[in-house]
Amino acid sequence: MEESKVKDLTAYKNRFEEDASSFSEFQARDFVKELKNQGKTDEAIEVGRTFLEMAPELKGYINYFGYALYNKYINIDDEEISKNESLFYGILEEIAKYCKQERYSPLEAAVNKAIKHVLKADPVDYKKLSELLDYLDAPTLEDKPFVNKDGKEFESKKEKWYRMKVRALYELESYRTCVETANIAFTYNLKWHYNNLNWVKYYRASSLVELGRYEEAENEFIALQGHFNAVDAFEILYKLYMNTNREDDAYTLLIDKFFKGGFDYKNIEDYKKISAMAKAKGQDKAHVLAECLIKKLEEENGKTYEADVDLADYADLTASDAFDRVYSEVVYHLENYITRHEGKVVFYNHDKNFGSIFQDGEENLFFRQADFLDDEEVEKYDVVEYSVIKTYDRKRQQMSSKAVLLKVLYEEINY
């Protein structure tokens, strides 16, 4: 097969030298296009910049000029970018100034290259990332997922933009704009990938906390709890409750986690919270035992811990023994720490091990057998003691509540 003939550009070059403003739309486009395609990048850039000055009415060559800039200054190794970042970002700004966000434009490719460079830094410059994203018009970005040659599906350009923009705004402490941007993202019928949607919800909820919109934030974090393991929703909710004078909610959440978590070094921070709770509630024995548990467990794992009380009376206890003592002091004396309620079981499914408790004037309260403090036989009409935590009903897509830390008090005979 014969090689394609390289176009002779002598006539264009002579005309350019004589009068650059005399080019027609087609001639200017063809000249810059051929220079770029023939690898004469520097000439394509020089000609393009001259046309911008001498023939501002011409537009057809712009994207070829932009790609010449992209090839020479943008599409290079990160090491080369780092040597002269001011030049790199200056050229990017030039491309953004003249090239529209459209098909055959180098704008998106140039911005994406810059974004990749920024994201490789540690720490990430979120101000620069946000500025780069602003070069693009988010509403007009492609919203169809990208599919590679192997048929694997990835996030769309629009999904990617909102994922990064919401994160950047949060990191920049632009909390109100972060919430507003996330809200806009939710209005689009996007097919979300990976955990992108949950991350957007997380940064939105975290911004709501900073804005003092605590109830909205609480609901969002509760909805994420148990569904998005990349973040510790318990820790966030605990701090939110403690910082908004809702210690009872915080302690209920804490004790429920303590009850279910068992004896494990990975729960050491929970044990420290238990100790602080016991101290705040004036439960001296539980506080001392919790301090003993923490100290012994840290020592067994090669670490040190300075207890805030005298532990001489418990020097012979192992960490496991101390845990059992703390568990008994807390779990079997819940009334010393959190609000307790009484109610009657009005439904129980023995096959699925869940049921509900009657609430006057409200929807019956859901519970699971696994949330009972002891392995008790639960029957309809049993009167139980329990505490309440907020949950998210995924089936009905709404906030709800459930009973936790239950124990059977007695069977109601008069039913």
Show which residues each predicted segment covers.
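Single-residue signature of alpha-solenoid repeat helices
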Residues: 44, 129, 178, 217, ...
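Beta-strand/loop nucleic-acid-binding surfaces
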Residues: 360-378
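OB-fold/S1-family single-stranded nucleic acid-binding modules
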Residues: 387-415
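Solenoid-like repeat scaffolds
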Residues: 14-23, 49-57, 95-102, 137-142, ...
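Short boundary/loop segments of OB/S1/cold-shock single-stranded nucleic-acid-binding domains
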Residues: 303-344, 407-415
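Structural motif corresponding to the intra-repeat A-B loop/turn of tetratricopeptide repeats
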Residues: 38, 72, 172, 211, ...
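Generic helix N-cap/helix-start motif at coil->alpha-helix transitions
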Residues: 20-29, 57-63, 103-111, 153-164, ...
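Residue at a conserved register position within TPR or TPR-like alpha-solenoid repeats
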Residues: 35, 69, 114-119, 169, ...
